[in-house]
Regions:
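NTP-dependent nucleotidyl-transfer catalytic core
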Residues: 1-153
Length: 153
């Protein structure tokens, strides 16, 4: 059984948009990322499925990259029912370091933090450069946003 067939059999791949990716998955040597926000200083059960999937890819010869959402961690991330407590830069830095220390025990990996390439972008530059790619109708129709709007959060 190939790696792709195994991942599909396990229900970890639902469909693909490009058949060429099958050979790349089976061959190995791809770099992939596992992303997480530094909302806490420890890995937890919510990370389990993604990390097991990542470990399987690593065992097949692919290279994991841990992507920490330091910028997202400072802003907060919408939850369906409540506001998330905003964390300070110091808290997200501490949490990111702790998460990376734990992840590197599981993987031979590097870590990048999206805060590093986003913190110097001013709001006008961001909106002009990236805002055009955000569709407000799409965002409003997301269930998380809908439920927050309906509940007044």
């Amino acid at each position: 059984m190939t790696l792709f067939e195994e991942l599909k059999w396990r229900g970890l791949i639902h469909n693909i948009t490009d058949e060429a990716v099958i050979d790349k998955i089976n061959k190995g040597g791809l770099t992939f990322y596992v992303g997480t926000d530094p909302t806490g200083d420890s890995l937890h059960v919510g990370h389990l499925l993604v990390f097991i999937f990542a470990k399987r890819l690593e065992q097949a010869g692919h290279h994991p990259l841990i992507l920490i959402g330091g910028a997202t961690g400072c802003i907060g991330d919408p939850k369906p029912t409540a506001e998330r407590k905003l964390l300070t830069k110091e808290q997200t830095d501490h949490n990111a370091k702790c998460l990376y220390e734990q992840a590197k025990r599981l993987f031979n990996c590097e870590m990048v933090n999206n805060y590093d390439w986003t913190h110097n972008i001013d709001i006008l530059t961001f909106l002009r450069t990236y805002g055009k790619f955000f569709n407000v109708n799409y965002m409003i129709n997301k269930e998380t946003v809908k439920s927050r709007l309906d509940s007044g959060i």
